[in-house]
């Protein structure tokens, strides 16, 4: 399940650091968070879908690695992103 193009472009605009920014950690984390949030209802309805759950866990761990990278390089940007996305910590 992919993020819709319109929704994806809105997320990129909201979290981009510049006009053509699509690869900064903030944008990547925001896109992963959007995909994770879209998949959550699927797993509540389909608890035995272990194949897709593996993909979800990969996305969660990738988001965690990006957040760790951002935290080690710029703690202020990390805190702002966590607050803006409503993630824990």
UniProtKB/Swiss-Prot annotation:
Query: Keywords of this protein's UniProt record, alphabetized?
Result: Ribonucleoprotein, Ribosomal protein, RNA-binding, rRNA-binding
User: Would you indicate the residue range of the signal peptide?
Assistant: none
InterPro entries, alphabetized: Ribosomal_uS15, Ribosomal_uS15_bac-type, uS15_NS1_RNA-bd_sf
The UniProt entry's GO biological process terms, in alphabetical order, are: translation
GO CC terms in record: cytosolic small ribosomal subunit
Q: How does it assemble?
A: Part of the 30S ribosomal subunit. Forms a bridge to the 50S subunit in the 70S ribosome, contacting the 23S rRNA.
Record's function text: One of the primary rRNA binding proteins, it binds directly to 16S rRNA where it helps nucleate assembly of the platform of the 30S subunit by binding and bridging several RNA helices of the 16S rRNA. Forms an intersubunit bridge (bridge B4) with the 23S rRNA of the 50S subunit in the ribosome.
Cite the HAMAP family for this sequence.
Ribosomal_uS15_B
**Family statement drawn from the similarity comment of this UniProt entry:** Belongs to the universal ribosomal protein uS15 family.
What name goes with this protein?
Answer: Small ribosomal subunit protein uS15
Record the organism: Cupriavidus pinatubonensis (strain JMP 134 / LMG 1197) (Cupriavidus necator (strain JMP 134))
